[in-house]
Design a protein with these regions (language model features):
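Sec-dependent signal peptide recognition
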Residues: 1-2
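Substrate-binding/active-site groove segments that recognize
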Residues: 99-118
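Residues at secondary-structure transition points
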Residues: 74, 99-102, 126
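Short, solvent-exposed loop/turn and secondary-structure capping segments
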Residues: 93-98
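Amphipathic alpha-helical interaction surfaces
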Residues: 85-90, 110-114, 138-141, 145
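Short, functionally critical alpha-helical segments immediately adjacent to catalytic or ligand/cofactor-binding
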Residues: 56-65, 71-91, 135
Length: 184
């Protein structure tokens, strides 16, 4: 609780969790930290993400072209949260491909190094927030290069994350992001 200086009366503090955009990982105890880390990383890459309108955005976020900057950032964070369902079931300690792919977004240390991520070791990539921050760098590079969210499934985010290469999973991800308040 804070005091309003002008009247010295108590003022309720806003519920920050209620102000966060919806993510598919909201059921996880780390949700608030992951969402904040992802939104911060997306804001740092507005040049390739929220500042652009990808050619196939209507499939994933129908109102994106008219959306505010915070809504656009929420879309990119929401997209990662939807892809993470398929990559790791939102498990930050997940390890796949014989230990080559790590964490919530199943990044390899090699990919992390190629993109100049702070998290490059196996241990660091198993930190959910660090993995997501790195994933934003990877995503920004791919989307910036291709000008699409997923294109034919092998472009944009689909370059690095297999769920977008599968039409059924790509459609489910798009249905989820499209239904969020920041995309309507």
């Amino acid at each position: 609780m804070a005091l309003a200086l002008s009247a010295c009366t108590p003022v309720a503090m806003p519920d920050l969790a209620a102000m966060m955009p919806a993510m598919r990982w909201d059921h996880r105890p780390e949700a608030s930290d992951w969402t904040q880390a992802t939104l911060t990383a997306v804001a740092a890459r507005d040049d390739a993400l929220a500042g652009k309108v990808p050619a196939d955005i209507a499939t994933f976020c129908p109102n994106y072209a008219k959306a505010s900057l915070p809504e656009r950032r929420a879309f990119w964070a929401g997209l990662l949260s939807a892809v993470a369902k398929y990559e790791s079931s939102w498990n930050p300690a997940a390890s796949g491909g014989g230990g080559r792919y790590l964490g919530i977004m199943q990044l390899s240390p090699r990919t992390a190094a190629q993109h100049g991520c702070d998290a490059q070791s196996a241990a660091a990539l198993k930190d959910g927030a660090a993995n997501l921050q790195c994933s934003v760098k990877v995503m920004a590079h791919a989307v910036g290069t291709d000008g699409v969210v997923a294109g034919n499934g092998r472009q944009g985010v689909g370059r690095d994350w297999m769920p977008l290469r599968k039409s059924k999973e790509r459609a489910e991800i798009a249905a989820w992001t499209s239904s969020q308040s920041y995309c309507r």
